[in-house]
């Protein structure tokens, strides 16, 4: 609260005129972040609609990495949090999920988004080298490739990912994982496991 007060050029105690405590401030910040998630109009294709919704959640969490820690750590009662939860629940219910299956699907897809953002965080925030210079990154890449040379599968994998733009690679990984996750949920629906 002291740092926030200093940033606002006021005392830490002035912040308490607006919020009761740090937890309330975090709740408000989380709800404001969730306001950034666009709720797409339903198209009738629950998978496509859920992909769009979760893509928005991923974009928001990538822009505000601190939200991944807060998402399930406290109840979210703000209007934007409730709006988001309602949209996701409606999509899953329209697909046929109910009861424990609805709860599992709801939390699993959000946990997947949180995990993908957390896993990508260090790759986004840290350059390949401490200096961040292109020449140092290239030297590090060459060293990693040399270290992989005795291992054919690893060498081929490193060559493949080296050819991709980092953000594009992270997006492809997210899309692949989400597709597999939705395939599994679809299979459960087909098998009638949603009681």
Q: Can you describe what each PLM-predicted range is?
A:
Residues 30, 58-79, 87, 118, ...:
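Amphipathic alpha-helical segments used for helix-helix packing
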Residues 26-28:
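Short, Lys/Arg-enriched C-terminal cap helix and immediately downstream tail that follows
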Residues 122-195:
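C-terminal peripheral helix-coil segments that are non-catalytic and often amphipathic
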Residues 38-83, 99-109:
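Hydrophobic alpha-helical connector segments
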């Amino acid at each position: 609260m002291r740092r926030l007060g200093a940033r606002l050029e006021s005392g830490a105690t002035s912040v308490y005129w607006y919020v009761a405590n740090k937890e309330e401030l975090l709740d408000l910040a989380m709800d404001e972040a969730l306001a950034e998630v666009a709720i797409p109009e339903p198209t009738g294709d629950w998978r496509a609609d859920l992909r769009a919704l979760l893509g928005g959640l991923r974009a928001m969490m990538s822009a505000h990495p601190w939200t991944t820690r807060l998402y399930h750590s406290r109840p979210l009662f703000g209007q934007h949090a409730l709006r988001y939860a309602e949209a996701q629940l409606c999509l899953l219910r329209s697909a046929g999920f109910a009861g424990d299956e609805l709860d599992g699907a709801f939390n699993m897809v959000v946990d997947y988004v949180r995990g993908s953002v957390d896993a990508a965080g260090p790759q986004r925030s840290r350059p390949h080298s401490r200096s961040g210079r292109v020449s140092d990154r290239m030297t590090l890449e060459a060293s990693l490739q040399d270290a992989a040379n005795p291992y054919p599968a690893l060498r081929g994998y490193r060559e493949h990912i080296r050819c991709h733009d980092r953000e594009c690679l992270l997006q492809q990984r997210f899309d692949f994982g989400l597709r597999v996750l939705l395939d599994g949920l679809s299979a459960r629906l087909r098998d009638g496991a949603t009681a």
